[in-house]
Amino acid sequence: SHFMEKEIYEQPVAVANTIYGKLGEDDVLDNIFGLGSSEVFSNIKRIQFVACGTSLHAGKVGRFWFEQIAKIPCYVDFASEYRYREPLVEEGTLFVTISQSGETADTLAALRYAQEKDYLSTLSICNVPTSSLARESEHVLFTNAGPEIGVASTKAFTTQLAGLMLLAMSIAKSLEEDKDLRKNLANELRSLPEVISETLKLSEDISKIVPT
C-alpha cells in the first residue's frame, strides 16, 4: 500500500528518534527507562516478555539478545494466553510488555494481571506516551516512531527492536556484563539509521532484478 511504502522509508528517521539521547560515547546512558530503572536492572535475574502480533515477534528477537548480551534467561508469551495462566514468578523477574499503540487489550490485561504477581518491576516499550500501557507501567521507553497507518508493521517493528537492544544493553550495564561488547553495540546502534537509509537507496536496483 501507499502508506506501507511511505512508512518503510520513514524507518531511518524513526530509529534515529528511538535512540536519540540514549547513547553516550561508548555505552548506553543510565536510567533511560525512567528514574531508578538502572538500579532495578541491577537486581534482574530473568525477563518475562508479553505481547501480541508483530510486537510478540519483536520480543522473540529480543530474547536472543538478552541471553547473549545480558546473560539472563527470557520467556516470551502471547498476551492473550498469559492472562489465563497461573505463572510461577521467580525472584528478580522483570515483566516487559511491548505494544505499538499501548492500548492492545490483551497486553494491557496481561499487565494488570502481572501487577497482582510478585514481579521485580513492570516495563513497557511503546510508541504512544499517553497510552494506558505507558501510564500503568513502572518504567517505559517510547519508540517515537510516529503514527503507523499501514496494516503491515514496518517502522513500529524496527523501532521496537531498537528499544529492545537499548534495554538489553542497559541491563547488561547494570549487571556489569562485557563492557567491550556494549561499546561495539553502541557504535553499531548509532550508525543504524544511516545503514537503513543506504539500504533503502538500493530499492530501485533491486526492483530491476526481482520479478513482479
What is each stretch, according to the model?
Residues 42-191:
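Glycine-rich phosphate-binding loops that contact phosphosugars or nucleotide phosphates
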Residues 78-79, 198-207:
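A general structural motif
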Residues 1-44, 166-202:
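Cofactor-/ligand-binding subdomain signature composed of acidic, glycine-rich
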